[in-house]
Amino acid sequence: MKEEKRSSTGFLVKQRAFLKLYMITMTEQERLYGLKLLEVLRSEFKEIGFKPNHTEVYRSLHELLDDGILKQIKVKKEGAKLQEVVLYQFKDYEAAKLYKKQLKVELDRCKKLIEKALSDNF
């Protein structure tokens, strides 16, 4: 991933960027496989009404793979002779940290936008 600024849309952060941020953080925490990532996200955000779908989570993971940030490894599933599980690990941790840094700037901007809307209208 190049050292370039993430371009802002001028409004709120896109869902895919939001999910990619969480994929990176959960990989740092070694929550390593897709379905587990999906379960954790759904559990974490259930209370506030955000339920990421399977397709968006996997698209986010695949973008991180395409960007060279994550890589997949296949391991045999414990207790199963022929089944494999796909795990995600960092391929380029520096690029992952850069992405998080860029998203932090964007999320701070979005927070200010939302706070202004709440202040101005309620």
From Swiss-Prot:
The keyword DNA-binding applies. Gene3D superfamilies: Winged helix-like DNA-binding domain superfamily/Winged helix DNA-binding domain. One of its GO terms (biological process) is DNA replication termination. InterPro entries: RTP, WH-like_DNA-bd_sf, WH_DNA-bd_sf. One of its GO terms (molecular function) is DNA binding. Keywords: DNA-binding. It comes from the Bacteria. Homodimer. Plays a role in DNA replication and termination (fork arrest mechanism). Two dimers of rtp bind to the two inverted repeat regions (IRI and IRII) present in the termination site. The binding of each dimer is centered on an 8 bp direct repeat. This is Replication termination protein. The lineage of its organism: Bacteria, Bacillati, Bacillota, Bacilli, Bacillales.
